[in-house]
Structure formats: structure tokens, C-alpha cells
Regions:
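Ribonuclease/tRNase effector modules and their secretory precursors
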Residues: 1-157
Length: 157
């Protein structure tokens, strides 16, 4: 693992109490993205705020939950544990262990930050004058990693 990658934030450290754990996750997210707004690619970082759920921004929910229907997303403990990783990977995107490329999908362009050593992907939407951290998640299967590496290789050529 890269030495700059923060440790996992585990639910057991909060007595397996979901409410306490959720508060700790949001506190870390707030420190990383609300307190000191990072610059990425020389541009300010904004957040996808809507839909706001339980007083928390959509970006936060995308970092800690999964599901294709926004209102039905469910917490994913592997995503939760890695709440500190999106900012760290964005801040260290020039590190050789982070494979970064831009990719068009429909009418949008996204940066993909693939930290293969940690099996973790961060997606940052390019909005011209600013960027939006869109989602971030662990890569669970080897075939997913192979696809990401193929996309990275396609970008490089």
C-alpha cells in the first residue's frame, strides 16, 4: 500500500454502533472536503450536494454506499472503511502508483484515479472551471482490475 494512504476507519472502532460510525465517517468526509477544499488539476473541488439525505451531501453517500437507484443506495462497509482514501488519492494523483486518465462518458468527462495497489478507484467529474468528486469504491474482482488497466493502457496510447 502507498505510505500516504490513511488507515481504514472501521466500524468496530465505534463499538459497532452504526449511528456513531456514520457520524465519524461524515466528520472525516467534512474535514477532507468541506473544511479545506482541495484543488485538483489546478481547479477548486465542489461537491454534488443533491439529493441531500439526512443532512449529508450526495457525494458523501456515493463514497459510502452503492446501488443504481439514488434513493435506494445501501451502505457498503468496504466503502465506509475507505472514507479517507478519496482525498488522499486525489492529493497524491501524481504518485506513480496512481494511474490517472480522462474519459468521456456520454456528455461528461471524468478523471479516473486507479490505485491498483490498493484496488481502489476514485472518479472525479470535470466541470470546466471546477471538479466534482463523483464516486469512489474498492475494486473487488480481478476482472474489474483488468478492465481498468485496459482503459488505462488505451488512454496512454
Amino acid at each position: 500500500m502507498p505510505p500516504w494512504l490513511p488507515p481504514l476507519v472501521q466500524m468496530a472502532d465505534y463499538g459497532n454502533d452504526w449511528d456513531e460510525y456514520l457520524a465519524a465517517l461524515y466528520q472525516r468526509f467534512s474535514i477532507d472536503f468541506l473544511g479545506a477544499r482541495p484543488l485538483f488539476d489546478g481547479r477548486p473541488t465542489q461537491l454534488k450536494r443533491h439529493p441531500v439525505s439526512e443532512g449529508k451531501e450526495a457525494t458523501f453517500w456515493h463514497f459510502i454506499s452503492d446501488g443504481s437507484v439514488e434513493a435506494d443506495r445501501l451502505p457498503n462497509l468496504r466503502r465506509c472503511e475507505r472514507i479517507a482514501w478519496p482525498r488522499a488519492i486525489m492529493d497524491n494523483c501524481a504518485d506513480p502508483c496512481v494511474k490517472m486518465w480522462r474519459e468521456a462518458r456520454g456528455s461528461s468527462i471524468n478523471f479516473h484515479l486507479w490505485c491498483e495497489e490498493a484496488m481502489y478507484l476514485v472518479v472525479v467529474a470535470d466541470r470546466g472551471s471546477f471538479v466534482l468528486p463523483w464516486t469512489a469504491y474498492p475494486i473487488e474482482y480481478e476482472h474489474q482490475a483488468r478492465k481498468l488497466n485496459a482503459r488505462w493502457e488505451k488512454f496512454r496510447t
